Each structure stands twice: as C-alpha cells, then as structure tokens.
C-alpha cells in the first residue's frame, strides 16, 4: 500500500517464512514467552517494542509461532492491552509534538500544513477503529485534549 501524503510507493517489505513452526534452536516455551510479554507490558512497552525485545533477547522470531496467539491477544487476555491502538497513539503523539512546536513558532506554515496532514490521518484511522469496537463509538480526536491521551 502506498503512502497517504507523499510520493512513496511502499513496495519494499519483508515476508514471513513459509514454515510456521518455531525453530528448533528457539529455547523459550509458550508459557515463558507469555510471562515475558506480560512483564514487558507492565513496564510500559508497546506491542511492537515487546516483539523487538523478544526477538533480540530470547531469539523469538514470531510470537504467534511459539505461543499460537499474537502479542496483542496475549495482552488482551491478561488485561494489559493499550486503550488506544498503537498506530493511532503514535500519530497522536506526533500531532502533540507538532502542536507544541507551533506554540513556540507561530509563523511555521510548513509545520501547520503537516499538522493538518497528521490530524487528517488520525481522523481517517479512527473510523474503522470505531466501527469494529476498538474505540468507543463516540470517541473523537480533539487537539486540545490530545496531550492527555499521550501522557
């Protein structure tokens, strides 16, 4: 899928291995991986950071191959899932950063333009999340309250 507000085509990307079984050299069991996922989530790690740290420290390439369920599902079962989806959270964080910059530099028209792009991306992303129930149906992004969502 191409980029929304730029000329990038989005062609490059990695593909998952065909064999879905955990590698023979993978040492941790499913229960150990689940415990580690919960421990890292309690420390405040996002699901993608959890996956990266499991890959780097324990050698778990794909959590789903070892445990049978994805990281976010493990977090939901244990009640540790984030309230706002990760991609939306990072977009809101970016909008808050640009907003803080614009309060110091009011004449930055390029920054204002990019803030509009980020906010439109946020609005477009919230629609499917509201429809499938990830977010509340009356959830709405407001730039005034965005810093409380990210904090």
From Swiss-Prot:
GO terms for cellular component: cytosolic small ribosomal subunit; nucleolus; small-subunit processome. InterPro entries: Ribosomal_uS15, Ribosomal_uS15_arc_euk, Ribosomal_uS15_N, uS15_NS1_RNA-bd_sf. Residues 1-20 are annotated as: Disordered. Pfam families: Ribosomal_S13_N (PF08069), Ribosomal_S15 (PF00312). Keywords: Cytoplasm, Nucleus, Ribonucleoprotein, Ribosomal protein. One of its GO terms (biological process) is ribosomal small subunit biogenesis. It is found in: Cytoplasm; Nucleus, Nucleolus. GO terms for molecular function: small ribosomal subunit rRNA binding; structural constituent of ribosome. The keyword Mitochondrion does not apply. SUPFAM superfamilies: S15/NS1 RNA-binding domain. Belongs to the universal ribosomal protein uS15 family. Component of the small ribosomal subunit. Part of the small subunit (SSU) processome, composed of more than 70 proteins and the RNA chaperone small nucleolar RNA (snoRNA) U3. Component of the small ribosomal subunit. The ribosome is a large ribonucleoprotein complex responsible for the synthesis of proteins in the cell. Part of the small subunit (SSU) processome, first precursor of the small eukaryotic ribosomal subunit. During the assembly of the SSU processome in the nucleolus, many ribosome biogenesis factors, an RNA chaperone and ribosomal proteins associate with the nascent pre-rRNA and work in concert to generate RNA folding, modifications, rearrangements and cleavage as well as targeted degradation of pre-ribosomal RNA by the RNA exosome. This is Small ribosomal subunit protein uS15. It comes from Dictyostelium discoideum (Social amoeba).
